[in-house]
Amino acid sequence: MNPRAVILLLCAFGCVSDAFHRIAMQRHRQRKLPHARHLWASRKHIRRKFGVTAAAAPQSGGSSTNSAPSEAIEPLFNAYETQFYGPCLVGNQPFTLQFDTGSSDLWIPNANCTTCAKTCDNSVFQAAKSKSFVANGTAFKITYGIGEVSGVLATDTVSIGQISIKNQGFGLVSQTDTCSSFDGVLGLAYPAVALTRQKPPFYQMIEQKLVDQPIFSFHLKSNTTDGGSLILGGSNSSLYHGSLTHVNVTEQKLWKFTMDYIGFPSRKCRRCNGCNAIMDSGTSLLVGPTEDITQLNRKIGAKYNTTNGLWEVQCARIKYLPVLELGIAGKKFHVRPQEYIIAYEDNVCITGFMDLAGINFWIIGDVFFREHYLLFDVEQNRIGIAVAK
């Protein structure tokens, strides 16, 4: 067994309690954005992910045709769009997956994906090494912001921590146009947006009685090599301050809710005022309508660079910037400038606020997750939020 496999196995099976299952998360080695093109790729990715065109209203959960699952539209994540991922076994073979509350499908690279193995250096699935593998044979193609992936559907045992899901459907990718720092994606949104039409893994856990409670939660960490954890089947009150504030899901597709407002109270800037928002662990930034994002950026003195399309601030100014405030379910939640500002190049930083023309909702990404404990309740269709320790 190669060293990488050993490390993943130790991580996957050494982090468990009787009440819930803790999955150790890894964090991308750096928060510095290496090139402006990654932001543009991010914008395209999010547009595809939520089915948005520049001139059209959004269709939550992406786009597909009635003839799917042979064709569907869903994202593929690159290394700089999301920073947190964790271990998983498929057919007893180790992979790193991005756990995404903004999608519902599970896919990993197949052995015949030469780009995945040689160019991207991802782990690939070898069907001959799994005794529980069952080929489905149904072809699928997934279109995302900067390319597409395609392959076939299959079924196998999927293990996350000490949870082993039998007969889990997933996609085996044989062609891809881009690389990521993790091998695949495991979606945690509702089954209604599962574009491969396979039951999402967490719903399989519930059906097979593998978790005590139909809830999962995120505790992500910043400025540390320990990325935090994904907790399946429960929550851990020792990881947050006070009690959870709950907000109801307004649509059982994505984790969509009503946000009271977002802004900088100290600078008399308040946007949104009762709007739709999506809690998305698969997006690293805070994304919103162009007018609102422009106002947020201007209130902190950010300058728009027309050459690279970025809102820039001098890194030395971070300590003088205001705290961002989000009003949710009548409570106030805050994000410090150290979290919403991202290093770009020498002495120049960019803001974590990205606009997307054509949307009338907000996407709350990892900028918010890093400061808060997030609980997702499948049974009661609600999100719990508390300040993380």
What are these regions (language model features)?
Residues 79-93, 256-275, 353-357:
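A short acidic-Thr-Gly-centered motif at the start of a beta-strand
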Residues 2-6, 10-36, 43, 93, ...:
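Aspartic protease catalytic domain
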Residues 275-317:
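Extracytoplasmic, non-cytosolic globular domains
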Residues 2-96, 104-106, 208, 384-386:
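N-terminal accessory segments
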Residues 112-114, 192, 236-238, 292:
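Acidic glycine-/aspartate-rich tracts in secreted/extracellular proteins
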Residues 68-174, 179-181, 311, 321, ...:
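Signature of the N-terminal lobe/flap region of pepsin-like aspartyl proteases
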Residues 227-275:
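Flexible, small-/acidic-enriched active-site or ligand-binding loops
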Residues 88-90, 95-102, 106-108, 185-186, ...:
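Short hydrophobic beta-strand that contains or immediately precedes a catalytic carboxylate
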